[in-house]
Structures are given as C-alpha cells and as structure tokens.
Amino acid sequence: MASDGKWFYYYEIGEGNPIYKKIPATDASLMRIISIPIQPADILDLIAGRVPLREHHTVILHKQDTGQGYVLVLKRRWWGVAEKIYMDENKTRVRLIEYYNRNGTLIYRAGFNEMQMVSGFQVPARLSISNGEDADFQLDLNRYYTDVPVTDSMFVLNPPD
C-alpha cells in the first residue's frame, strides 16, 4: 500500500498474480483489504500518534462510569455521536477512539495499547484497530524514523512490469 495524498495504490493479492489498484485517495477505504472501513489517512494519523477528528458541532467531557478516566464525546447536530475519545485520569493520554455512523453504529475502534518516545515525539508502539465485531488487527511499530527527508516518488506504488 502507498498513498501520495492524491492517489491510493495497492496490490490485491489472492489466487494468481497480484492485481494493481489505483483509486482516488478521497474514496479510499481499507474495507476490502482488512474488513474494517477505515481510511488510509486515519491509519497514518493513528501511526503518528494523532487522533483523526470527525466533523462535529458539540463536545462533551464525561467522567467514565467504569474505570478511571474521561470520555470526550463529539456530536453532530442532527447525527448524534460521531466520535468518542477515551482519555486517562489526567486527560493527557488518549487510550481509545471510537467512530460511529449516523445510525449510532460503531464503524471502528482504535486503541493506543502502548506508547513510546522517539526523538521527542510520543508515538504508538502497539496500535489495535477493530470493527467491534469480527475483524481486528494489531500493529506493532518497532522502527520509527522522524524528520526523514522524503520525495513525492516515495509514495507511489507502480504497476508491475
């Protein structure tokens, strides 16, 4: 998989030869690849330790009913809950994020299971993503590079020859 911000490139691997795919990044979803409807931009934000924020009109901070910590609830005017952000007791660390559709059904859940300091940045060491039902995966990030010079060509996956 690769993305240059304009296009999302990937190889679909099944029986036979890999199939090269190129779709607009704005339409990209990893549903066909990992069975979770998450956008590549969201994955990149999560890997960078950022929280992808959904459009919202209201923000409410609640103390968690079970366990310690707080929940930041982002709501849209006619939609209801768009996103929930679960934080620690000090409100300094995000532990879990949940995204919802307009029916209130969970789209996906992302958890920062372990964090690490790399060159002064707080980034995930272990990240888990789930649809809340039958699909989930875990990313273990053990090599992190920061402030690396990059060129546009590094983000393009070319079709096979």
Regions found by a protein language model. Give the residues of each.
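Short acidic/polar capping segments at secondary-structure boundaries
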Residues: 15-17, 25, 50-51, 77-80, ...
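Gly/Pro-enriched, hydrophobic low-complexity segments
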Residues: 60-160
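Glycine-centered secondary-structure boundary/capping sites
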Residues: 35, 49, 154, 160-161
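Hydrophobic, well-structured mid-protein blocks that either form specific transmembrane helices
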Residues: 24-69
